[in-house]
């Protein structure tokens, strides 16, 4: 594969995050429309990450927009300790990840295209639009198997309690992806 410049949308339409709230009269209203809080290009420019919402605690405090303010000021790393991250990820044709392990719980929903999920135990599944997977700490890699079409996925990432497998603590093992998740404030 030849080296390409980083690209972010791969021919997919721009995403829009619509935020609702309750006005002073108690009516539901749309308060804003944007593309989320943070955006990053990963995987040698073949994967785009859009952080749509993150919270440092559950249940959420939505009084006076505290949740929206926190989300906009705190860029998540891989996930949010004791919280939740809501993320859209787009994959260019043949774009994907290397092997890695994330010590977290992820709901993954395929929105458009196909995503191949491989596990270190030797199993592989190709997920189609509408398919979901619950990723619970395995060493894995993902990739878009198409040579022509992009893939869009939606991720909800939750922290987990310390988990032991055969007496060994399950930890993040990000390999080549270690520097791709930057935590911090805007």
Swiss-Prot record:
Cell inner membrane found in the keyword field: no
InterPro entries referenced in this protein's UniProt entry, alphabetically: Cupin_2, OryJ/VirC-like, RmlC-like_jellyroll, RmlC_Cupin_sf
Stretches assigned to the Cupin type-2 domain: 88-156
Entry-linked SUPFAM superfamilies: RmlC-like cupins
UniProt keyword Cell membrane, yes or no: no
Residue ranges of coiled coil: none
Transmembrane segments: none
Keywords carried by this UniProt record: Virulence
Pathway given in the UniProt record: Mycotoxin biosynthesis
Similarity comment text for this entry: Belongs to the oryJ family.
Physiological role: Part of the gene cluster that mediates the biosynthesis of the selective antifungal agent ascochitine, an o-quinone methide that plays a possible protective role against other microbial competitors in nature and is considered to be important for pathogenicity of legume-associated Didymella species. The pathway probably begins with the synthesis of a keto-aldehyde intermediate by the ascochitine non-reducing polyketide synthase pksAC from successive condensations of 4 malonyl-CoA units, presumably with a simple acetyl-CoA starter unit.
Name of the protein in its database record: Ascochitine biosynthesis cluster protein 2
Organism: Didymella fabae
């Amino acid at each position: 594969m030849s080296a390409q410049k980083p690209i972010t949308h791969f021919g997919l339409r721009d995403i829009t995050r619509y935020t609702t709230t309750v006005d002073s009269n108690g009516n539901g209203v749309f308060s804003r429309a944007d593309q989320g809080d943070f955006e990053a290009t990963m995987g040698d420019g073949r994967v785009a990450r859009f952080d749509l919402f993150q919270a440092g605690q559950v249940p959420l405090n939505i009084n006076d927009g505290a949740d929206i303010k926190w989300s906009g000021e705190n860029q998540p790393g891989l996930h949010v300790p004791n919280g939740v991250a809501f993320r859209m990820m787009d994959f260019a044709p043949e774009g994907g990840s290397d092997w890695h392990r994330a010590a977290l719980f992820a709901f993954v929903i395929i929105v458009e295209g196909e995503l191949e999920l491989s596990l270190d135990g030797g199993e592989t599944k190709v997920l189609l639009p509408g398919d979901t997977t619950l990723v619970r700490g395995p060493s894995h890699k993902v990739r878009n198997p198409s040579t022509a079409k992009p893939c869009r996925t939606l991720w909800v990432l939750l922290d987990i309690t310390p988990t032991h497998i055969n007496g060994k603590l399950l930890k993040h093992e990000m390999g080549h992806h270690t520097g791709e998740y930057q935590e911090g404030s805007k």
